[in-house]
């Protein structure tokens, strides 16, 4: 009877993976003797085959889940309509509650029938036995066997806790349960007295901004967190996860962030290969509708690096909602996991981000200054110009206030706090992070990210003549135009390198540098173009085109 109840309440099982190399798939948790017998993958098909009863019950429950999601998103309009029609009176609500209760009882009965179907299936009984044993004792052997199954990630045991590193226990400098530290925007009206009366006056605007951010704004900014989209993408996500596990020996893990969100991760270890780049770990930060199963992790994987992918809060197996604070909390536990559980030194970690993933990448660079490098592909400097682009002009004040208070993705501000090597990849046909049309390459916000970075690091070089030369170079939309502008100013790269190395040897590596202070205008132009070319590479593609492995290069450094 206990096993039947476990089958009724147990998670949905999607797939049984082919047997993998046990040494590479084993967890780093010390092994203890308690374990359950391993499932034989040779006798069962790798795709889980539910019996007819379980299959049909699953279909009914999945359909009910979709209807519930549609009802949830349309509830404000439905309540308004019912109110206008007078259907919210007590005489109408009571019969409706009876219908709803009957429907819930029917769905509970369907769930029980699904449990009976699972109970009669030896594949599911074997799986639930392994899952229960792993929850009781997370030995290396139990976790290895559990990794052979793909199931509802909510039932996966936590592999790493944000407080697990010994350096954080009792530390005042680490994150609290409220979250890690973020850079806060400056007040919109500096110098205004923050009196009680002013607070009352601003209250309606603050309430409106909060409602917009937590309803329409968050879902527009992170469409991958919408349940219906995830439901539609589920077959593709399962296929991508199977590829990472079976072909790349990926290891899935659940991390618990300081805010209580559970973060879904996938690690592919290449340290045992002959390729030297396998010693470096690339942590990938996906876009606003990207998942590690089908996202940018494929680029460093093809290039031979060790890779750690993770899903935003609210995406696929990760819980929570993707607001900036939750995003930073998730990134923090991912980096801690890479250092303290996977065993990578910060100097061997590269942060690679695509599009909106630039926020978490630049936060990690700011918070972990010893990491090796940062690569930002198709990213931007600030969210406000892009948000204003897609909203009506009459909403300008509301949009600006909402972004600054609740969705402040200040990539350039965070990136300027990082002292290490940086590479920006600009898509020359990008249709997402341009503020006008894709053909207008100067409206690409990647340009602003580059200019702000160079102006912070080399303020004496990026004066009027240097800034003008870099802007001309950024207007080039092809390699031929780039080379033409570069040769027009007769940039001597050896001279530029020698100047920078001499300054570094005398004054140290910390930015900002005062190099270029006593330099001629021609010298500043040469140095500005040289630095721009080293920090930004063009890729002739649209926003969503996967970056080929040959374009994945480590950033330049002296």
Curated annotation (Swiss-Prot):
What switches its activity on or off, per the activity regulation note? Specifically inhibited by alpha-alkylidene-beta-lactone KC01 ((Z)-6-(2-Oxo-4-tridecyloxetan-3-ylidene)hexanamide).
Has the keyword Membrane been applied to this entry? Answer: yes
Q: Describe what happens without this gene.
A: Mice were born at a much lower frequency than expected and are smaller than wild-type mice throughout development and life. Despite their smaller size, mice appear normal. Metabolomic characterization of brain tissue show decreased lysophosphatidylserines.
A single GO CC term for this protein reads: membrane
Which one of the record's GO molecular function terms can you name? monoacylglycerol lipase activity
Q: Where is the active site?
A: 355, 430, 507
Which InterPro entries does the UniProt record give?
Answer: AB_hydrolase_1, AB_hydrolase_fold, ABHD16_N
Which superkingdom heads the taxonomic lineage of this protein's source?
Answer: Eukaryota
Tell me which EC number(s) this protein carries.
Answer: 3.1.-.-, 3.1.1.23
Give UniProt keywords alphabetically: Hydrolase, Lipid metabolism, Membrane, Transmembrane, Transmembrane helix
Going by the record, the broad EC class of this enzyme is hydrolase
Note the topology in the membrane. Multi-pass membrane protein
* Localization in the cell: Membrane
Question: Which reaction is this enzyme known to catalyze?
Answer: 1-heptadecanoyl-2-(5Z,8Z,11Z,14Z-eicosatetraenoyl)-sn-glycero-3-phosphoserine + H2O = 1-heptadecanoyl-sn-glycero-3-phosphoserine + (5Z,8Z,11Z,14Z)-eicosatetraenoate + H(+); 1-hexadecanoyl-2-(9Z-octadecenoyl)-sn-glycero-3-phospho-L-serine + H2O = 1-hexadecanoyl-sn-glycero-3-phospho-L-serine + (9Z)-octadecenoate + H(+); 1-octadecanoyl-2-(9Z,12Z-octadecadienoyl)-sn-glycero-3-phosphoserine + H2O = 1-octadecanoyl-sn-glycero-3-phosphoserine + (9Z,12Z)-octadecadienoate + H(+); 1-heptadecanoyl-2-(5Z,8Z,11Z,14Z-eicosatetraenoyl)-sn-glycero-3-phosphocholine + H2O = 1-heptadecanoyl-sn-glycero-3-phosphocholine + (5Z,8Z,11Z,14Z)-eicosatetraenoate + H(+)
SUPFAM superfamilies assigned: alpha/beta-Hydrolases
GO terms classed as biological process: monoacylglycerol catabolic process; phosphatidylserine catabolic process; prostaglandin catabolic process
Q: Does the keyword Ubl conjugation apply?
A: no
Residue span of the signal peptide, if any?
A: none
Task: Provide the transmembrane region boundaries.
Answer: 60-80, 93-113
| PANTHER family from the UniProt entry | ALPHA/BETA HYDROLASE DOMAIN-CONTAINING PROTEIN, PHOSPHATIDYLSERINE LIPASE ABHD16A
Which protein is depicted?
A: Phosphatidylserine lipase ABHD16A
Recorded source organism is: Mus musculus
